Regions:
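Acyl-group handoff/entry surfaces in thioester-processing enzymes
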Residues: 3-81, 95-138
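Short, charged/polar, Gly/Pro-enriched secondary-structure boundary elements
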Residues: 83-89
Length: 138
């Protein structure tokens, strides 16, 4: 039985997490677990301040820092990493169309997350062609 992972206490999975781990290997892609959404506003943003704010959210929210691991017997566990500065991506879609931007964001959603010892969230700061700016959460 795993007690710690990379110096962090481990916890059993919730019923919902166990269900995901049960059916996910039978799916064509682990991206079946991904949900992507954008949040934008029609105003110019201070991108450095937004990046700083996103990192503060990561620091405050343990749920955004959950990682999964398996022990030698194959049992899944979860653990929470310490806060660290994340490299927040920026995508400038202002030179294209809204449809092209949406297609790219949909493509991001098709990429599965690594399930072992890796982040399970992704946030991209986005500048849209229609003058809206914000973030894409995945």
């Amino acid at each position: 039985m795993m007690r710690t992972r990379k110096g962090h206490k481990v916890y059993p999975l919730t019923v919902a997490q166990k269900f995901h781990m049960y059916y996910a290997p039978h799916c064509p892609s682990m991206a079946v677990l991904n949900i992507g959404t954008s949040l934008t506003i029609e105003v110019e943003l201070d991108w450095e301040q937004l990046k700083k704010s996103i990192n503060e959210a990561y620091a405050r929210s343990e749920a955004m820092r959950v990682r999964f691991a398996r022990d030698k017997e194959g049992t899944w566990y979860q653990y929470v990493t310490d806060p660290e500065e994340m490299d927040i991506e920026f995508a400038d879609f202002s030179g294209g169309t809204v449809e092209e931007a949406e297609a790219q964001m949909q493509q991001w959603t098709t990429v599965p997350f690594k399930m072992f010892d890796s982040p399970l969230t992704r946030i991209v700061m986005i500048r849209m062609p229609d003058g809206f700016n914000g973030v894409y959460f995945l």
